[in-house]
Design a protein with these regions (language model features):
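Acidic, glycine-rich flexible loop segments
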Residues: 89-105
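Tryptophan-anchored aromatic micro-motifs
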Residues: 21-42, 125-143
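N-terminal glycine/threonine-rich, aromatic-flanked beta-hairpin/loop signature
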Residues: 39-80, 108-113
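Short, exposed beta-strand-loop hairpins at the edges of beta-sheets
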Residues: 115-122
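Short, hydrophobic/aromatic-rich segments at coil-to-beta transitions
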Residues: 23-35, 49-52, 79-88, 108
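Boundary at the C-terminal end of the N-terminal hydrophobic targeting segment
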Residues: 17-19
């Protein structure tokens, strides 16, 4: 009985250790355009743990004169380790954005302090985005 209990706990601990093994994100998994509501994030793996990021963010709402929107943008390079990238936009180093790559072609984006990102009233990058186009995205600077 002691042996069976010992084996059970050993297997339980090994299983817990395996489930905590960090997931490495490959370039094909990362590359693409991700969408959430009307917002888009473009990601390109550059190698050496770097990602090129472009965010086109939209907060749509209805006003007395009809539909309108506030917008925000951010671009630059992020550093990725395992399945999590940290992004400070080129023009705003006080805005820390975390991008976590999830299973099912999704990313979860969080902002450390939304007000410091200065995207515009009610505009945020936060949310769970789904990959809407795989492969190398076209960035605004490339056009």
């Amino acid at each position: 009985m002691k042996f069976a209990v010992s084996v059970f706990f050993t297997l339980l601990l090994c299983g817990a250790a395996l489930s905590q093994t960090p997931r490495i994100v490959t370039a094909p998994q990362a590359n693409g355009t991700y969408g959430y509501r009307q917002s888009e994030i473009k990601i390109l793996a550059l190698g050496h743990n770097k990602l090129r990021i472009q965010m086109d963010l939209i907060f749509a709402y209805k006003s007395p004169v009809g539909p309108t929107a506030n917008t925000g943008e951010a671009s630059g390079e992020a550093t990725i380790e395992n399945d999590t990238a940290i992004f400070y936009p080129t023009d705003n180093h006080s805005c820390k954005i975390t991008i976590k790559f999830l299973a099912g072609n999704k990313i979860k984006v969080t902002e450390e302090d939304t007000i410091n990102c200065g995207f515009g009233m009610n505009v945020t990058s936060a949310g769970t985005y789904t990959k809407i186009k795989a492969g190398k995205p076209k960035f605004d600077e490339d056009r």
